[in-house]
Amino acid sequence: MSNMDFLPISKEDLKKRNIDVLDFIVVTGDAYVDHPSFGTAIIGRVLEREGFTVGIIAQPNWNNIEDFKKLGKPKYGFLVNSGNIDSMVNHYTASKKKRHDDFYSPGGKSGYRPDRAVIVYCNKIKEAFKDSPIIIGGIEASLRRFAHYDYWDNSVRRSILEDSSADLLIYGMGEKPIVQVSNLLRYGMKIDSIKNVRGTTYIEKDISSLKDYIEIPSFEEVSTNKKSYAEAYKIQYYEQDSIRGKTLVQKHKERYVVQNPPQPPLSQEEMDEVYALPYARTYHPMYEAEGGIPAIKEVKFSITSHRGCYGSCSFCALTFHQGRVIQNRSQDSILKEANMMTNMKDFKGYIHDVGGPTANFRHRACKVQEKHGTCKNKQCVFPKACKNLIVDHKEYLSLLRKIRKIPNVKKVFIRSGIRFDYLMYDKNDEFFKELCEHHISGQLKVAPEHISDKVLNLMGKPTRNVYDSFVKKYYDINKKIHKNQFLVPYLMSSHPGSDLKAAIELAQYIKKMGYTPEQVQDFYPTPGSLSTTMYYTGINPLTEEKVYVPKDQKEKRMQRALLQFSILDNYDLVKEALIKAHREDLIGNGPDCLIPYNKPYKKSHKKNNVKNNNNHYNKNNNYNKNKDVSKKNKKNSLSKHKKRK
């Protein structure tokens, strides 16, 4: 592929296209990948379809102002995002340790973007072009649109609109708002006059003319009073609906952050149009010498079938970004994309995924949503399935069957996550059977997250007995179809509500599983989630009940160690945790014990004289039998963070 297959990135590209001045320039923290899994590509191609010229400045050197000037000054403004992931999540682990890799950067190396990329980029653009409008969007801007708790600062920060000095913020999926805003700019409207576009947030000095709005506790209140913070979050949480949601206002000193109601969901026709745009479907050739962009490997042969999720897991901020209403593509659109993939020279016959935030949520949760929107204080699948919930996998199954029949397609995997509770609600086992028979490769990844009902309730997840029933059914089906396939559970430590007692309960469950899971991670308090509000305030904002929060680093390390109690390096922490919790009965050689009385010696490999730092012990734990199951799935914590359902 040549540069002409991509949006322009240089003055040479502009010259070849006879462009003197670009209409918009996108500045992004990710490398430039022209694929519909990347927001920069979608927004760029949508604007191109509308007749605008768009250039890309990917991962500029924030210490060099000239990098922000290399495409000149745009006619209408700059569009700024941090990339597909919040830059702080991208840079730091849950324990605040610096990451050394970045799948969205050349060669998978870190260091190509700054911390708090949106703020840094906006400041540099203002320095380069003082009067050029700046519109911010993407996950970092979207989830920080109000005053928010910032885990890395361990304090409440102002709206990112205040800190970045941007002119307008587009939150959520931005296709509709960016088209409306760009057309208003084309018609001659000034950026500071654009105040009525849904899905946007702006700063206002005077709100006397504003109508039908809710004012939430101010920045000054939420930064000093945790009850006020919880109250502000609850109102935000309840109003994220395009039909019933109201305008929200939050005072910041003498100014106001104003969030217009969310944009309406894209129709099926609109979704089809977005995914049919002329993407190059790979990274820009300028990265080839550096080893390419690793993130493309996971998505190049994956298909987005829908957006949105009504699962409402407390630790997921999707409600604030994609929303609870499912927006799906037509089968024809998806089949065209699958057929196109089979003609790509590096296609090997495997489609890696057909799904979305939750693979088996292919349609709206109920008919009520179409007229009245999502329920304000009621969830679709938690704590139990709503009576109006439509439980049906038939359409999704028919889609998968059609893709399987496409010539040159050997296998169609589902990797984006299955909601096992929704699967269990379906009395028709046809989808479950074909899932096991055709769409997994030896193992299915699921996200029970915990097994303590107290913790699960705060997570917004189904009770333990639902997961237990699912596990039994999964193995029963595999036995019937003569397949020896495993489950790989995602598990989380230190979530609000999880004390040592709950962590030990989970460790005992893992003991009965018979192997040590690799897919575990500490709770990560990221912006925008219900769980993050619990973490900061110690309050469940929806019930106003107090919540125990494990914040002490020693206890957090203990909880994580308990989830991998059979790893020798965790022995001391596990023993200390068991003694602290008065569970010495779990120390010893009995069948229910987690660890032996005495710490075993590490075995060393005499051949190369290197110690094996991942030794396992405890003959009563049948880990070795299934060790390959977890070993195959060892991934960096960033990808685990993305894939939880």
UniProtKB/Swiss-Prot annotation:
Please list the GO terms describing molecular function. 4 iron, 4 sulfur cluster binding; catalytic activity; iron ion binding
The entry's keywords: 4Fe-4S, Iron, Iron-sulfur, Metal-binding, S-adenosyl-L-methionine
Q: Where does [4Fe-4S] cluster bind?
A: 309, 313, 316
Q: Which SMART domains match?
A: Elp3
Q: Is Magnesium given among the entry's keywords?
A: no
Sorted alphabetically, which Pfam families does this protein's record hold?
DUF3362 (PF11842), Radical_SAM (PF04055), Radical_SAM_N (PF08497)
Q: Where is this region: Disordered?
A: 598-645
How the cofactor is bound: the record states: Binds 1 [4Fe-4S] cluster. The cluster is coordinated with 3 cysteines and an exchangeable S-adenosyl-L-methionine.
Q: Does Hydrolase show up as a keyword for this record?
A: no
What PROSITE patterns does the record tag this protein with? RADICAL_SAM
The cross-references to InterPro entries, in alphabetical order and at most eight, read: Elp3/MiaA/NifB-like_rSAM, rSAM, rSAM_horseshoe, UPF0313, UPF0313_C, UPF0313_N
Where in this chain does the record put each Radical SAM core domain?
Answer: 295-566
Biased composition regions of type Low complexity, renumbered to the chain: 610-624
Which segments show compositional bias classed as Basic residues?
Answer: 600-609, 632-645
Q: What cofactor does this protein call for?
A: [4Fe-4S] cluster
Supply the NCBIfam families for this chain.
SAM_YgiQ
Which protein family is it in? Answer: Belongs to the UPF0313 family.
Name assigned to this protein: UPF0313 protein CLK_3381
